[in-house]
């Protein structure tokens, strides 16, 4: 099992700092997504079966160890929870309720009454810009991972019709447009949401630019609103 860093002192011996990074489920997300893409392109059922087995193993492993996906990985669980979209694509291709139930669980962790970070859905309805949701945004406000989670929230709306999810992503996108656009036609500063629109210069990751484009394309496809 490799779900999170349990010993920060041991990690420090290797990394020279108390590193809590664990990208296992993030990497499994892209493995799952790749299997589903090649299945949808070519129709070979072995790739769908491999995707199913991978997802079942992950869900069962979390259950067996009594670990919530929001408590895995790093950056408040966002890299791990971004598996939401391919998990829903898998549900769409199989109809297996196990994958929808797991997706619903992830959405619940993003819309919590207790306010635990990152709480992306709930916070999108607040008046605060993203970088002010919690203290020390450098510890949690990762642009790519956050937008990838919200892409999954849109997929959840597409499959379930939950309009709260659509509205949350619309509000989130409005906040990013207002507070996080940078001079490079991307969003965020370096790899974080940090009120980039207030900076006179810019630095960005290509993945942030790509996911900002993806999020707007998805919103336009779902709403027809030309602003996206």
Task: Label every model-predicted segment.
Residues 1-228:
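Glycan-recognition and catalytic cores of secretory/periplasmic carbohydrate-active enzymes
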